[in-house]
Amino acid sequence: MSLVIPEKFQHILRVMNTNIDGRRKIMFALTSIKGVGRRYSNIVCKKADIDLSKRAGELSDEEVERLITIMQNPRQYKIPDWFLNRQKDVKDGKYSQVMANSLDNKLREDLERLKKIRAHRGLRHYWGLRVRGQHTKTTGRRGRTVGVSKKK
């Protein structure tokens, strides 16, 4: 970071209900938004014509608005479907990038749907067990430990 701080420097930006550290480079600062990784933030910055060496606090309001519109409407800016984190949605069949609070809502809806249709994954979630086929005989135990009493 340069020794002289510009007069319009923002130390904390508020983007999509998330506080972003203004001292970090813009590509890495955007990853603090839930649902945005390094690859997605990189392509969004390139589509918005923002210099990747800039700090997040150095951006103008117009540049921040441009970033937000591209992140919310990625398909309009020719970001490919395989790049998005919500593909062929169960309800409407659309491709989208789900971020921030809507990511939590979508995840909860998906789990509720799995539980409602009594799918194996939904039942494992309901019971609080491992879902992805891990062994559970010895690992992942929680709760009260039962010790072995010593023989007299």
Curated annotation (Swiss-Prot):
One of its GO terms (cellular component) is cytosol. GO terms for biological process: translation. SUPFAM superfamilies: S13-like H2TH domain. One of its GO terms (molecular function) is rRNA binding. It is found in: Cytoplasm. Gene3D superfamilies: 1.10.8.50, 30s ribosomal protein s13, domain 2. Its main location: cytoplasm. InterPro entries: Rbsml_uS13_C, Ribosomal_uS13, Ribosomal_uS13-like_H2TH, Ribosomal_uS13_CS. Belongs to the universal ribosomal protein uS13 family. Located at the top of the head of the 40S subunit, it contacts several helices of the 18S rRNA. This is Small ribosomal subunit protein uS13. The lineage of its organism: Eukaryota, Metazoa, Chordata, Cephalochordata, Leptocardii.
